[in-house]
């Protein structure tokens, strides 16, 4: 495995991790893992990237605060519901259609566009996650899979085409709405854990675009 393919694997893992955080409430077991040496080492290593340092440290700060709550898992689950599962007036709804389509309705053109990406690359949406295709967790899971598929390409031309597809996907399907999604999450997530997650997501996407564009 060369340095670039190893780096791609790390990128995929980060996107899958962020997808998992934004797909459902953390269980008690998952929350306990965030206090483990392995996870804290992962976060510390991520924070060593200067462009990510502030965002990662903000998340670590919120994780530390979570551990001090009396009913940590229940309260964080309530935060998840408040942040993402309310109405568009009270929550930061995690669907691209809510930000990119003038109708303001779910399953609009951005969801159709996402279904086309899934079909083009023969990547299946997880059957147990019954959400519109433009849910943030589905888009991030797709991106992780696209990165892994990139590493599987045999020719240099195919590899470069898949790297280019990643750049297009991030710009068109993610950075077109996640900054606003993060702003609303900051406004409506009073405790701030999920606002820290979406803040890190946007920061990482912007850094990843620079990497993919060769800047």
From Swiss-Prot:
It is found in: Cytoplasm. Pfam families: Nitrate_red_del. It comes from the Bacteria. Its main location: cytoplasm. InterPro entries: Chaperone_TorD, DMSO/NO3_reduct_chaperone, HscB_C_sf, TorD-like_sf, TorD/DmsD_chaperones. GO terms for biological process: protein complex oligomerization; protein folding. GO terms for cellular component: cytoplasm. Keywords: Chaperone, Cytoplasm. Involved in the biogenesis of TorA. Acts on TorA before the insertion of the molybdenum cofactor and, as a result, probably favors a conformation of the apoenzyme that is competent for acquiring the cofactor. NCBIfam families: PRK04976.1. Belongs to the TorD/DmsD family. TorD subfamily. This is Chaperone protein TorD.
